[in-house]
Amino acid sequence: MHLCYFDENKHGPDNPHFFIGGLLIPDKKALDFENTLSQIAFNFFGARSLIQANELHGKELFHGKGNAKGRKLEERVQVFQDIATFVTNNQIPVRMVCINVERHKNKYQYPMPAYRLGLMLILERFSEYLEQEDDLGLVFGDYEADEVTGAVVDFSEYKSQGKTPMYFGRPLAGYGVFHPVASQPIFTGGRFAGLHGGSL
């Protein structure tokens, strides 16, 4: 089984691209990976406690705000480097979706909301990987009060239909520390591409 963690950014006039993406963690390696991430958090925060104050979120680290406020740039960059090394060395699959929200709205007469479209597409990408690996997956995401109800309905519909409703129509079979880390590829991917995906 793979544990599939996803996160998304907040889009708006200053940030027109909606990013959603995540990591697929093999369950057999989850505890070892958690220990590594706890060490990275300890190196930065001086604590291993699984509390919000010790979460490694891309936005706060990049801007030096929130729980990274007052920390030196070199220290914050080191966390990004450590996470990138961790993901790369462990060959952790990363999947991302980027939607230009205005272009999407203008392309269709009745466009699907960006969050629902992005959720559908990231589930398709997770499913595609799991199918290649001949494995099952368990998906974890944020509790977004304004969007969670629709997302739960989407999950339910995708499950009952056995696949997502459009685009690739990929089949969706059966149905702590990794989720904040899932925000980092989204944040850095958007920044690297110059598409301002960094407002997680």
What are these regions (language model features)?
Residues 1-200:
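Phosphate-ester processing/binding pockets and catalytic centers
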